[in-house]
């Protein structure tokens, strides 16, 4: 079966692994998924990630992060721009997730970045997902 939205699958695997308190989650590799994982690590949503070669497309291993008393760091992840309905924003229309407490991942001409970085650089683009 062909996967129509690999990014949504990536986000769903992280969401599901987080809900059942897994330490790690493995997903098929791609450049966009690596960029999203890098942003999630920089913003403090995951502990770490690594790319593992498997002879095909590779695997991204994500180490999920939990706070004291096993409190979840990732409360929610939502896919915004989908293959059937792309969502684009101009530089002055970049959304704030939970009033600035969450993060929007935006695909710009300079690569994937957070909503804060896109606002700072004056770039618009495709809204990939929200993380809070």
Swiss-Prot record:
GO terms for molecular function: rRNA binding; structural constituent of ribosome. Belongs to the universal ribosomal protein uS8 family. HAMAP family: Ribosomal_uS8_B. The gene is rpsH. The keyword Nucleus does not apply. Keywords: Ribonucleoprotein, Ribosomal protein, RNA-binding, rRNA-binding. The keyword RNA-binding applies. PROSITE patterns: RIBOSOMAL_S8 (PS00053). One of its GO terms (cellular component) is ribosome. One of the primary rRNA binding proteins, it binds directly to 16S rRNA central domain where it helps coordinate assembly of the platform of the 30S subunit. Pfam families: Ribosomal_S8 (PF00410). This is Small ribosomal subunit protein uS8.
